[in-house]
C-alpha cells in the first residue's frame, strides 16, 4: 500500500513538473513589449516620379509592437507590424491617375547575437505589399505572397530600438512578386499609366 502511494505521488509530481516546465520556460522566453501603438497618417504632397511632376494623396495605417529580444539585456529589439497604405498619383499635366496600395504583416521572427552590439534578424513579410491599379481601378501589377529577409543590425548599445542596418538581403520569396523581376521597369509602367 505504501509503495502504491509513493509511486502515484512520484508520477503525479513528474506530470506536474513536465507540464509546468514548458510554461515556466515560455514565460521566461516571452519577449517583453517595449512599445506598441497604431498610426493613421493621411498625406498629400507634390513629387517627381520618373521625371514626371505629380500630386500624391493617400493614407498609411499601421499597428505595431516593438519587442525586447529575450537574453539581450534590453539591447536588441524585434518588430511586428500590420500595415496598409494607399496612394493616388496624379499627373496634373495630363489629368491621368494611377494608384499604389499595399497590405501586409511584417514580423522579425528570429534574432541571433553575432558579437558586441551586432545582431542578425530574420524577418517574414506576408500579404500584398505592392499593388498598382490604373485609373479605372484595374490591377495592372500585384506582388503577393511571403518574403523572407535577413538583416544585420548594430543596436548601438543604447537600450533603444534604434539601430544601424549593416546588411540587408531578400533571401526567399514564395508567391508572385513581379516588381522584383530583373526586367521590371517601374518608370515604363508609370509613363504608360499617367504620362
Model-predicted regions and their roles:
Residues 1-25:
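Secretory targeting and sorting signals
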Residues 26-195:
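Beta-strand-enriched cores of mature, soluble protein domains
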Amino acid at each position: 500500500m505504501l509503495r502504491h502511494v509513493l509511486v502515484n505521488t512520484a508520477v503525479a509530481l513528474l506530470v506536474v513538473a513536465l507540464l509546468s516546465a514548458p510554461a515556466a520556460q515560455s514565460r521566461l522566453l516571452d519577449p517583453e513589449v517595449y512599445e506598441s501603438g497604431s498610426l493613421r497618417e493621411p498625406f498629400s504632397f507634390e513629387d517627381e516620379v520618373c521625371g514626371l511632376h505629380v500630386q500624391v494623396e493617400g493614407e498609411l495605417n499601421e499597428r505595431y509592437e516593438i519587442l525586447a529580444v529575450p537574453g539581450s539585456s534590453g539591447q536588441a529589439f524585434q518588430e511586428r507590424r500590420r500595415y496598409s497604405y494607399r496612394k493616388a498619383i496624379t499627373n496634373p499635366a495630363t489629368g491621368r491617375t494611377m494608384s499604389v496600395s499595399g497590405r501586409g504583416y511584417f514580423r522579425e521572427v528570429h534574432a541571433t547575437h553575432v558579437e558586441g552590439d551586432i545582431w542578425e534578424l530574420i524577418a517574414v513579410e506576408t500579404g500584398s505589399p505592392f499593388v498598382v491599379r490604373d485609373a479605372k481601378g484595374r490591377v495592372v501589377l500585384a506582388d503577393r505572397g511571403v518574403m523572407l529577409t535577413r538583416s544585420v543590425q548594430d543596436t548601438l548599445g543604447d537600450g533603444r530600438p534604434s539601430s544601424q542596418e549593416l546588411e540587408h538581403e531578400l533571401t526567399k520569396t514564395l508567391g508572385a512578386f513581379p516588381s522584383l523581376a530583373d526586367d521590371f521597369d517601374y518608370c515604363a509602367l508609370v509613363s504608360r499609366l499617367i504620362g
